[in-house]
């Protein structure tokens, strides 16, 4: 699998101990979902959730996933035609529910447990649902997302650059979680 991922251009390393080693290290795992494939479709002209979700899917669910952006009125037809999973559209399983965004839905449905990812989800939710009061980083993500959109009118080009932004933001969230755990141990 490592070689297949490297061949696909992904920076993959072999984890000694496989999934057991992953779990023993306390790293997040996910629930297997039957009908979800490696092809996902959503509305064109992504900003926040429609870039955050592909990042989440490619980093935690399916590293070889393909993402398709189409006009909103074509999402369901393309999903059926291409056997793709629709996301971030009204009524989709992987869509907004209440005050939660599609990013939250994916985390919930796949049962991904990771404190850094929970922090990132709050940032994404605040930026995507116009609630910058959730955490100070929401406004920054919103600004970066609109800047990326203005710089990259091609959706896949924006996605390529957006993945780098989300990698960095997730790393920052992990560092914050580690700092919090260290402070808790010191206080104990």
Segment roles from a protein language model:
Residues 38-133:
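Polyanion-binding interface signature
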């Amino acid at each position: 699998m490592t070689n297949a991922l490297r061949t696909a251009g992904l920076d993959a390393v072999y984890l000694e101990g496989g999934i057991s080693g992953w779990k023993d290290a306390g790293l997040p795992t996910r629930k297997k979902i039957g009908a979800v494939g490696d092809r996902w479709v959503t509305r064109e002209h992504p900003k926040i959730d429609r870039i955050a979700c592909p990042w989440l899917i490619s980093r935690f669910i399916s590293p070889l996933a393909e993402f398709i952006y189409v006009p909103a009125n074509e999402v369901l037809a393309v999903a059926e035609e291409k056997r793709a999973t629709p996301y971030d559209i009204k009524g989709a399983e992987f869509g907004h529910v209440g005050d939660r965004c599609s990013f939250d839905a994916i985390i919930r449905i796949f049962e991904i447990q990771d404190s850094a990812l929970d922090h990132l989800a709050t940032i994404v939710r605040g930026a995507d649902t116009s609630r910058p009061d959730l955490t100070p980083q929401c406004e920054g993500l919103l600004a970066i997302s609109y800047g990326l959109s203005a710089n990259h009118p091609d959706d896949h080009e924006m996605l390529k650059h957006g993945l780098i932004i989300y990698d960095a933001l997730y790393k920052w969230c992990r560092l914050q979680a580690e700092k919090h755990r260290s402070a808790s141990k010191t206080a104990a």
